[in-house]
From Swiss-Prot:
PANTHER family: MYOGLOBIN. Keywords: Cytoplasm, Heme, Iron, Metal-binding, Muscle protein, Oxidoreductase, Oxygen transport, Phosphoprotein, Transport. Its EC number is 1.7.-.-, 1.11.1.-. The gene is MB. This is Myoglobin. GO terms for biological process: removal of superoxide radicals. InterPro entries: Globin (IPR000971), Globin-like_sf (IPR009050), Myoglobin (IPR002335). Belongs to the globin family. It catalyses: Fe(III)-heme b-[protein] + nitric oxide + H2O = Fe(II)-heme b-[protein] + nitrite + 2 H(+); H2O2 + AH2 = A + 2 H2O.
Amino acid sequence: MVLSEGEWQLVLHVWAKVEADVAGHGQDILIRLFKSHPETLEKFDRFKHLKTEAEMKASEDLKKHGVTVLTALGAILKKKGHHEAELKPLAQSHATKHKIPIKYLEFISEAIIHVLHSRHPGDFGADAQGAMNKALELFRKDIAAKYKELGYQG
C-alpha cells in the first residue's frame, strides 16, 4: 500500500491539528477506544479500574498515555511510510511485553478517525479520512509483519 504525496499532505495537515492539543486528542481517542471496545481496557492494568467516562476524563495517567500513543504515531506518520526505525521498537514492545492484538490496532484506528472527524470536520473530509485510513492501514500491515517476525500472531 502506497500513499501519494498529496495523501500524505492531507494526513500531515490534520496531524498538525492533533499536535496542537496532543493530550486532549489522546484522551478523547483512548476514551472512545475503551467505550467502543471495553475488552481493550483489560490490556491496561493501570486503567482497568476506570469504569465511567468521567473517571477516564479525570485520569492523568490516561491523558499521559494518550500523549505517548499519539507522539509515537505522529513520528511514524511523519516518515511517510519509511518508518522501519520507529516501528521496530513499537512492534517489539506491543508483541512481546503488552501482547496487543492487531485487531486492537484496528479498533484504535477507528477511534482516531472518529475523533479527528468530530473535532476537525472542516479539515477532515472524505479525502483526508481516506488518506488517514490508508496511512493507518499501512502502519497496521507493517506492524503485523514485525509481529510475525517476532513470532507473535496477535
